[in-house]
């Protein structure tokens, strides 16, 4: 079984072409931002050693930058629920955590307790 820890990032009221009312719930997964990759061909051992020393510092600086906190948002699931379905699901709000489980051809979504 695969389990995804999702975060609700938006909740919007929308209408379909027939006028039926739905609540659109967008869920993302936050993943760690990969560190910078050094692409170089160093025949020189001194250059290679310098890169091994510098790369951890560069990675730390990139993760400390204010634009994302070292994480990226990966869209995972969008739900279109009626008012009744949302009530049965449990009222979720922006910032709430939901668990998405995938197993044997089934996808289960539930708010984290």
Swiss-Prot record:
The record ties this protein, via Pfam families, to: Arcadin_1 (PF18653)
Instruction: Please state where this protein is localized.
Output: Cytoplasm, Cytoskeleton
Membrane-traversing stretches: none
The answer, when asked if Cytoplasm is one of the entry's keywords, is yes
Q: InterPro entries given for it? A: Arcadin_1
* Main location per the UniProt record: cytoplasm
Would you tell me the Gene Ontology cellular component terms? Answer: cytoplasm; cytoskeleton
Question: From which domain of life does this come?
Answer: Archaea
Q: Which UniProt keywords apply?
A: Cytoplasm, Cytoskeleton
The note filed under miscellaneous reads: Belongs to a conserved five-gene operon within Thermoproteales denoted Arcade (actin-related cytoskeleton in Archaea involved in shape determination).
Listed under subunit, the entry gives: Forms probably oligomers. Interacts moderately with crenactin.
Q: What is this protein called?
A: Arcadin-1
Q: Which gene encodes it?
A: rkd-1
């Amino acid at each position: 079984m695969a389990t995804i820890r999702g975060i609700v990032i938006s909740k919007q009221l929308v209408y379909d072409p027939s006028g039926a009312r739905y609540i659109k719930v967008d869920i993302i997964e936050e993943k760690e931002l990969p560190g910078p990759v050094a692409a170089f061909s160093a025949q020189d051992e001194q250059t290679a050693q310098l890169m091994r020393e510098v790369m951890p510092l560069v990675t730390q600086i990139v993760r400390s930058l204010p634009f994302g906190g070292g994480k990226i948002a990966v869209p995972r699931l969008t739900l279109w629920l009626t008012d009744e379905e949302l009530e049965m699901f449990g009222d979720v709000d922006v910032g709430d955590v939901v668990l998405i489980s995938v197993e044997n051809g089934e996808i289960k979504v539930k708010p984290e307790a």
